[in-house]
Amino acid sequence: IKTLTVLATTPPQLADDAFSGVDVRNIKLTVPKGSKKAYKNAPNWNRFFKSPKNVTEQCPDEYAIIPIPESAVYQPGKTLSTKKLGKIVAPASLANEQERLKEVLGNRLGIKNFNKGKHPIVLAIDESIGKKEAYKLTIDEEGINITGADATGVFYGIMTLDQMLIPEQENSKLAYLNAVTIEDKPRTKMRELMVDPCRIFIPYEDLKGMVVEMARYKMNALHLHLTDD
C-alpha cells in the first residue's frame, strides 16, 4: 500500500490493531481539505504522521502466521541471528522462488548481498513430505531450510517466512528468529478472495496488487462479484 484515501472529514474510529504489521508512516494518507489537523490528532490515525525509527528487536516467542500452520514445534532458548543470513542455496528449478526469497530478505532485513552469510537458507523439493503445495520450514541455529512437495510448496514456505520476519514494532528489523519446525499443507483445494467491483469501481492496477497479497496468505482464486442478476 502506497496511498490511502479517506473521504470523511471527521476521522472514523480506528481500532488499535488496524494496519497491524504495516508501516503506515511509509503510506501517504490523503484526507479532505481542512481535515488534516483532525486526523493528525485522532487516535491511531496519528500514526500516519510519525517519523520512522530504526529499531532492532527480537521476535516474539511464537509467530503470528495467517493461515495458522498445521504444525509448529518450537525449540525454546534457541535462536538464529538474522544478521548472518544472506546466502541462498537452491536448484535451478527453483530460480523463481529464489528470486522471491531475495525480495523478502531485501524488504524485511535490508539484505543486498546474497552470496555471503554464515547461515544459509536452503530451498529444496521433496515429494515425500506430503501432497501438492505442502511444505516444511525449519529454523535452527545453523540456518533455514524450506522444503516443498513442489515449487508451489516452497513458495508458500517463503511466504510463511515473510510473515515471520514482520516485526511487532513498525519500521524495525528482527535481530533473531526463534528456532521452530513448521509443517503445513492446504486444507482446501481452493482458497478464494471475493472482491465486489459490482458496487464500487476497482482499478485494474489495484486488482493486480490484491493478487500479490493473496499469494502472501496462500490464496489461489480471485472471485470478481460483477452482478447480482
Q: Which residues are covered by each model-predicted region?
A:
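Short loop/turn motifs at secondary-structure junctions
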Residues: 1, 25, 189, 218-220
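Solvent-exposed loop and capping/linker segments of extracellular ligand-binding repeat ectodomains
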Residues: 1-55
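Hydrophobic residues within beta-strands of alpha/beta enzymes
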Residues: 4, 29, 193, 222-224
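Solvent-exposed loop/turn segments at secondary-structure junctions
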Residues: 35-36, 151-153, 200, 228-229
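Short, solvent-exposed loop/turn elements at domain surfaces
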Residues: 37-40, 96-98, 130-132, 200-203
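Acidic, contiguous N-terminal accessory segments
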Residues: 55-189
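An acidic-aromatic substrate-binding cleft motif
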Residues: 180-202, 209, 215-217
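Aromatic-lined carbohydrate-binding/catalytic grooves of carbohydrate-active enzymes
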Residues: 217-229
